[in-house]
Amino acid sequence: MKVRDVIKALEADGWHFARMRGSHRQYKHDSKPGLVTIAGHPSKDLHPETLQSIWKQAQLGGKP
């Protein structure tokens, strides 16, 4: 799954962009605790374990 697709899924769940440093983007949710960090350029594919970690941070449960 590409970084661009992960960002779209997070934004659809209510996460919004908080800050960026280099290629690391951090997203924040109004009602869920913590931040979700997504590393990489939008056109690049994420490693499956990295994707699983992002879903866990975002409390999304599984694959979209």
Language model segments and positions:
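Short beta-strand
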Residues: 17-20
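Active-site beta-strand termini and strand-to-loop segments that position acidic
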Residues: 27-31
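C-terminal structural segments of small proteins and small subunits
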Residues: 4, 8, 13, 32-64
